[in-house]
Amino acid sequence: MNDVRKILLRISYDGTRFCGWQKQVSGSRERAPSVQGELEKVAEKIHHQKIAVIGSGRTDSGVHAVGQAAHFCTPMRNILAYRFIPAFNSLLPHSIRITDAREVSSQLHARFSAVMRTYRYHLHCAPVAYAHELPYCWHIARMPDIHLLNQYAATLKGELDCTSFAAAGDKSASKSRYFYDTHFSFNHRVLTFEISANAFLWKMVRSLTGTLLHCEKKRCSVREFVRILHAKDRRLQGPPHRRMGYSYGTSVTPNTYSVQNRNTLARELASTGNARWKTY
């Protein structure tokens, strides 16, 4: 194992044509194109052997990424880590780009060392949406009350049981997740919902976004939203957000995730603002 190096990648992709990050294999064949599948095909071409590419987490179909982390182990000793950037990009479809590559400790794991995942949903708020924005924004023909939405969002902090926003098929052993930051912002017709947590349940962000907007449209009080959150009853969800219009980023640390890391990261987020979108 001493002859194997671990390389950490930063990846951006347009997820429109992909079933998500993770491969979906039937027998020996991939059922639908995936981001992981495309990366592993290229890694195999570069190394002339099968190479596993491990991502920081799964994403739903149609999710775009600006900074997802993934790692692979390479037996190549003489290539500098940054040279994997053009090596991969010359063979990948244009919808997937490697934006950074660096050698890391063998103890770092893209999934288990990840301290935070961030989703951004983009909603185009206008009577008519621009055609070129439709693949990347959810169109709603009204302007929601951003003040009320942020009042709801302010209740999503710290460790919370997210059963109310879990999908029917979610198989997570624990439904608790740790929220770092949740807020709405508005800029040039686009309302953005940003949520950062240690991890998410399957389709949880879609369900949560839909519930927030459903509550805002009904003019629910903050207390009513909190009641849904703590009910642990997914039947109280609002209609889920459609799949398009959201992007994903990951922050990783050389240390395995711990409560101590949580508290440190929460303090750092409060003082660094957009720095939370840096991958490493």
Swiss-Prot record:
Chain positions recorded as substrate binding sites: Y119
Alphabetical keyword list: Isomerase, tRNA processing
GO molecular function: RNA binding; tRNA pseudouridine(38-40) synthase activity
Keyword Isomerase: yes
Family annotation (Gene3D superfamilies): Pseudouridine synthase I, catalytic domain, C-terminal subdomain, Pseudouridine synthase I, catalytic domain, N-terminal subdomain
Enzyme class label: isomerase
Listed InterPro entries: PsdUridine_synth_cat_dom_sf, PsdUridine_synth_TruA, PsdUridine_synth_TruA_a/b_dom, PsdUridine_synth_TruA_C, TruA/RsuA/RluB/E/F_N
Pfam families the UniProt entry points to: PseudoU_synth_1 (PF01416)
CDD domains: PseudoU_synth_EcTruA
A single GO BP: tRNA pseudouridine synthesis
Record-linked PANTHER family: PSEUDOURIDYLATE SYNTHASE, TRNA PSEUDOURIDINE SYNTHASE-LIKE 1
Subunit structure: Homodimer.
Function: Formation of pseudouridine at positions 38, 39 and 40 in the anticodon stem and loop of transfer RNAs.
Family assignment from sequence similarity: Belongs to the tRNA pseudouridine synthase TruA family.
Protein name per UniProt: tRNA pseudouridine synthase A
